[in-house]
Design a protein with these regions (language model features):
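Ligand-binding clefts/hinges and TM-proximal coupling segments of bilobed small-molecule sensing domains
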Residues: 162-180, 218-220, 251-298
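Extended ligand-binding regions for polar small-molecule ligands
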Residues: 62-74, 147-148, 152-161, 233-272
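C-terminal segment of classical bacterial N-terminal signal peptides
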Residues: 15-23
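Extracytoplasmic small-molecule ligand-binding "clamshell" domains
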Residues: 27-108
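Acidic, polar ligand-binding/catalytic clefts
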Residues: 69, 80-148, 224, 288-297
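A ligand-binding cleft/hinge motif common to bilobed small-molecule-binding domains
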Residues: 95, 109-120, 165-172, 191-228, ...
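Bilobed "Venus flytrap"/periplasmic-binding protein-like clamshell domains
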Residues: 41, 46-50, 60-77, 113, ...
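Periplasmic-binding protein-like
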Residues: 46, 129-137, 204, 212-251, ...
């Protein structure tokens, strides 16, 4: 990428803007990069409905992207850069952390679970969703519980935290199960739908989003069993707590003003692109608690 050389006046204005935004803070490499290039780069998932995915116009959309857009709006104001641009870079479960670490993206706007292990590599914003993993099977399948998976093949998305969770369940219940991996959530659903796997294990909301936008949602059903909740957040670089603080302040402001609740209703309780499906998922008590008291705790 060719970097533009800023004129002296622009550099002076940028210096003043960076002084404003850093009042009481140490320097943020991410903010400096964004200010210098005049753009912020969003990493987004292409099939993580309704958090980040490609809509009817093949443009990135979703709850996480709405929140990231609010971060960009804050930067336009605080950096005095009304023309700040947004660049979109597709990421997947395998490359999202490396692309954040090497500076290809400035923030990941997806559906990534905050874990203690991942915190050794990246930082997470305040929780933006509380999920629980579940098994999805064909509606015609005789499987009603995890015992029914014995002797079967199941699919998990490559790079998903739920690969570890699925293997733990299989080991604890002493099941003989073959686990295969798909490159993304859309392929996982395809593998299940074509009969190459008897079940798909993933977070309930991601399953609901993909199924709702599939050609025939009634051909699938989730098993009743749920597991420990997980917390989604926007990912930022671990070595840049100042940028994380800015992102957190944007989310906290949205939650305090009631705007987050409106965004939640938009994506979980109303028709969403590309097919106008409604996920019909009211906010859970666990999510309500996080909105009332925003936190990035596990």
């Amino acid at each position: 990428m060719i970097r533009k050389i800023l004129p002296t006046v622009a550099i002076a204005a940028l210096s003043l803007a960076m002084t404003d935004i850093r009042a009481g803070q140490a320097a943020s490499q991410t903010l400096e990069k964004i200010g210098e290039l005049g753009k912020i780069t969003f990493g987004y998932r292409e099939t993580s409905i309704p958090f980040a995915y490609l809509g009817a116009d093949h443009k990135p959309t979703g709850l996480s992207l709405d929140l990231c857009a609010a971060v960009a709006d804050r930067l336009r104001s605080e950096l005095h850069r009304p023309g700040l641009e947004i660049e979109y870079v597709p990421v997947n479960a395998s490359n999202r952390i490396p692309l954040l670490q090497n500076g290809t993206i400035d923030i990941e706007c997806g559906s990534t679970t905050n874990t203690a292990d991942r915190q050794k590599q990246v930082s997470f914003s305040l929780a933006t969703y509380v999920a629980s993993p579940r098994w999805l099977v064909s509606a015609a399948s005789p499987i009603v519980g995890t015992n029914g998976l014995d002797g079967q093949t199941v699919v998990v998305t490559q790079g998903s935290l739920n690969l570890t969770v699925a293997k733990k369940i299989i080991d604890e219940q002493k099941l003989k199960v073959t686990v295969i991996q798909a490159k993304d959530h859309a392929e996982s659903l395809f593998v299940l739908g074509t009969g190459r796997a008897a079940a798909w294990f993933e977070d309930d909301i991601l399953i609901a989003g993909l199924v709702a936008n599939s050609p025939d949602p009634k051909t699938f059903r989730m098993l009743a069993a749920t597991y420990e909740p997980s917390y989604y957040g926007l990912m930022t670089r671990r070595e840049d707590p100042e940028f994380k603080a800015l992102v957190d302040s944007v989310i906290k402001e949205k939650m305090g003003s009631g705007e987050f609740n409106k965004l939640y209703s938009k994506w979980f309780e109303g028709p969403i692109p590309p097919r106008g499906q409604n996920l019909l998922l009211p906010m859970s008590d666990a999510m309500k608690a996080r909105v009332a008291s925003p936190s990035d705790a596990l």
